[in-house]
Amino acid sequence: MSSQQETNDKSNTQGHPETDPEGKTGTDTGNTEDSPPDTDNVPITDDAIMDDVMDEDVKEEDIDYSWIEDMRDEDVDAEWLFELIDECNGWPD
């Protein structure tokens, strides 16, 4: 085999995408069954937030209720407070 023929043979095997057994070509995403799922583009839901909160080991004595005492010390209009509570609970007027 001439050196020109060997050069042609080598160049024909380089630069071609690899083909998987199913005949598809493409880039490797790096995902395997053992790798964690991609969570960068997952929307955060109330359930997900609550799951995170519920996973925490929070003890009753660790919760800071001082803001309630501060509200009692302030001259707060009760109607405004009830409207705020209703709004937070999602209750309609």
From Swiss-Prot:
Its main location: virion. It is found in: Virion. Residues 1-52 are annotated as: Disordered. Residues 1-16 have a biased composition (Polar residues). Keywords: Virion. One of its GO terms (cellular component) is virion component. This is Protein 6.
